[in-house]
C-alpha cells in the first residue's frame, strides 16, 4: 500500500473515531423516573394485627420527537394476617397512568389509561401468607407539546368498608 493511501486510511480512521456517533433512528427513548412510597391503611380491617400496606410507585416518562411515553411500576408489601390467596381483601384496585402537559399551575391531563389488573396481584400471596409483589403497566403514549410529564394514581377499594375507590396520588416523573 502506498504512503498516500496509508495516510488517507489513517486520516479517515482518526476522523471516524473523533466524530460523535449519529443518533440512531430506532434508538430507545431515555426514561426519567420519580419514586414515592406511601403507607396505606386497609380501612376494612380494625383488628389487632398490623394492616398497613407499604406501596411504592415509580412513574417514568420519555420523549421521542413530539411523542411522550409513560409507564408506572408499583411494588407492595402488604399485611400478612389474611388467609393465603384471600380474594376478599379488596373489591377493586387499579393504577392510572397519565401524560400531562407541564404548565404553570395545574398540569392538564392529555391522555390517561387505567390498568385494573392489580387487584388479583395484591390478593395473591406466598404459602406463608406474605403479600409482596411488583406490577409494571404497559406503556402509554401521546403527542404532547414542548414539556410534558408522566403521573400515576393508585385507586384502592377495600372489601367491606363501604367507601368505594380511594385515591392515592404519587410523585410525577420529571418533565421530558
Language-model features, listed with the residues they occupy:
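Secretory targeting and sorting signals
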Residues: 1-27
